Amino acid sequence: MVLETSEGDTKKFLTNNNNSSASRNNNSHNNNNNNHSPKEIPEETGRSSSTSSNSIPNAHRTNAGQHLLGGSPSSACSTSVSGCGMPSEGLHPTAALQLYAAAAQLAPNGVRVPPWGPFLQFGVPGVFGPNGPFLGRPRFDAASAGGHPNSAAAAAAATQMAAVNASNAFANLTGLSAAALRNVSAAQTTAVAAVASTVATIQHRLMIGNRQSLPPAGPPSEGSNEDGGFPGDGDDDSSAAKRRRSRTNFNSWQLEELERAFSASHYPDIFMREALAMRLDLKESRVAVWFQNRRAKVRKREHTKKGPGRPAHNAQPQTCSGEPIPPNELKAKERARRRKKLAKAIDRQARKLQAKGITVDLEALKAEYISQHKANGTFSDSDLEDDGIQIDVVGGTDSDDEGDSDAVSPVRLGGGGGGGGGTGGGGGGGASSSLHCGLDGDGDSSRAGSFIGGGGSLGSPSSVAPPSMLSNGAVQFGKLEPMDGNESEERDRERDSPKPLLFPAKAFHQLNLQSSQQHHGLVVGQGQGSGSGHGHGHQHNHHQHHLHHGSASASAAAAVANLVHQTSPISMRRSNPFSIESLLFNNT
């Protein structure tokens, strides 16, 4: 404390420890009971500074910047201590600088921090002046740290530092020992380190918060203008899930370049697509989609429904070796198909007419059918050219509308059955020994021309009953023709020779029937029409047609040899009129 005597000279007295402790308690009491608002701090500081400088000329100003903390409870202590005139030499300049920096950073938004000059008069203006290297450095923005959650902790540390500096100044004023000053300096240094670490923590967290609040840095997305202003690439999975890509519009130059590239290759690789995208200022994904759409347009135009791993349905047909089928073979197959269609149509028409009881002339029916279809343009003369292929009207290998099987094929042994019911000759005594072989399972006689060994349509020369199945009265279209002895001998010779087989699958039935007919001497000549009459060709003169057993066995052996030749795989395929081997074999 400063005491003035009546003589007017000022003397300093050292008070005892009790007085000093009382002064310290008084200071702490002032710290606890202070309720000043932050807005009053600069005004009080200004008044205290002016009062101390005017009333006590020799008094020294204290570093009041320590106590300029926003809302700190040490503002009253700064006023009372500054009125005592503490010497500036008692406070370390570095500590004062650190405390002012902390106070400037942690000040709230509404508090104006005074400049450096009035508080730091240390006698070294070149270093600590307003334009010095310490004070000229930029400091943190006080507004950015005002609302930070760590500002209260930093304010508490700065308040503790201010209290330490106040006690240090009072100790210097009362003349404390050097050891006490060293202890106070150590505590001051510790507080300064705590404040510095707090400031560093605040700065680090502020930088992290700013980095998180900023938009992500990076180059702008390519082609965002053509995607309707949406950021990011349209192929990104996360962005594609949130939004829909807008339609891409190509200009004429881009379309010309894409068409030129498509004419060179319908399936460009990734490198070619990337080069096109860079040159045309497009995305690679848009180029790939354009090529997909262009290929789909080509397939739609050519009607090629191509699936994965197989050629288009209208591709050029190939053989098993992979080479295309020759044109002449294709033409031969087409002609055979048309002839088969013609024969089936005529046969169907003939059956309809026979069902109505009308006598059918197949040649006239065929000529009428061809003339009608020539007028329509669906038939031509080239379709009638015979390539040496025998056309089976019934369709021996193809399924027809009637359920035929090989089980009923031995029954079809009749001659060329057909129309009216002419009688085949006298006496009905032999009718019991004759076979009704011109009938199908349902009693229809229109298929009687499909006897074994034949192969032509009704009315054709090959549809006449073979000589081994005819008697003296041959039945053809319900009309009987008498035969003389020479013709009978020729028919007998032809009967002994084996006949070529059109369908080898029925060879066993033919062989068995031939041997049984030769042994028993049966001749079947019955043909039944759909009319009321039946044409019975009865057997006459059995002794003229009986054969010796030796000739029967010889003919059977010849038939077996022919059967072995005819049932080989190649011969079977050649005998099929619609097979490739048959077409090639007949063309040569």
From Swiss-Prot:
Residues 37-46, 488-498 have a biased composition (Basic and acidic residues). Residues 243-302 bind DNA. It is found in: Nucleus. The keyword Secreted does not apply. Residues 413-431, 524-534 have a biased composition (Gly residues). Residues 1-73, 210-247, 299-333, 377-500, 522-557 are annotated as: Disordered. During embryonic and third instar larval stages, expressed in subsets of postmitotic neurons in the central nervous system (CNS) and in the developing epidermis with a segmentally repeated pattern. PANTHER family: HOMEOBOX PROTEIN UNC-4 HOMOLOG. Transcription factor that regulates synaptic specificity. This is Homeobox protein unc-4.
